[in-house]
Amino acid sequence: RQNWSYALIDRDIYDINSYASRFIQEQAGRTLLSQVSTTVTYDMRDSRIEPRSGYVVRVGGDYAGIGGGVNYFRSRADAQYYIPFERWLNDPDFVLVLAAGGGILTPLGDKDDRIVDRFFLGGENLRGFYLGGAGPRDLATGDSLGGQILWTSSAEMRFPLPLPNEIGLLGRAFVDVGSLHGIPSSYYNQSLYPGARPVDDADPRVSVGVGFSWRSPIGLINIDFGKPVIKQDYDKDQLFRLGFGTRF
């Protein structure tokens, strides 16, 4: 199926901390975002709520610039493949999930892209790191800058816990891999940004961890414990993460 949407947003960035990165401070002010988006989804999973077999692929794009003050094209794609282990382990809750995703932000026109429109790495798409905890950063302040090119992949083994089924708990062990890079070349111009220390590399980050999902009365609750095993010194770790919504 294919979905289309249009967004017209008047964005105002203000009250920025005086200690924030120069790259963030220059973003202060109002911009008008006029964006057309589309997503094509091919879903062959056995269930959208709690899949145990099949796969889903999503491909989409966002075009901003129709009458607004922001101009870019952002492409994105992701896929998940579910491999049931019931045949070998005699339990439908043993499922291997392989996932991958990515995106590219291409600025259009003669202006640099804005931080808020870039991709960020960490949190949901790279457990063991804070949202924005990996990827381009201003070392002078420690602020994340986002990036134009993102890719992620993960392998996750889901398994039942030795508890009554009515409790609704499922465990998992995972390996996450991801990379984010790409910032404007103007960021390295010290005459424009004196004192700034931008760093940008495409080296992959890797984390491992365990977690569980609880089908609570108010919805799905996810708890993950992640540990980076390949990272940069300036990355920001997140050992514990609590999330709400559908991880399946």
Task: List each language-model region with its residue ranges.
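C-terminal outer-membrane beta-barrel translocator/porin domains of Gram-negative envelope proteins
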Residues: N3-R197, Y234, L242-R247
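A generic beta-sheet turn/junction motif
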Residues: V175, W214-I218, F248
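C-terminal structured "cap/appendage" subdomains that terminate the fold
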Residues: Y187-D233, F240
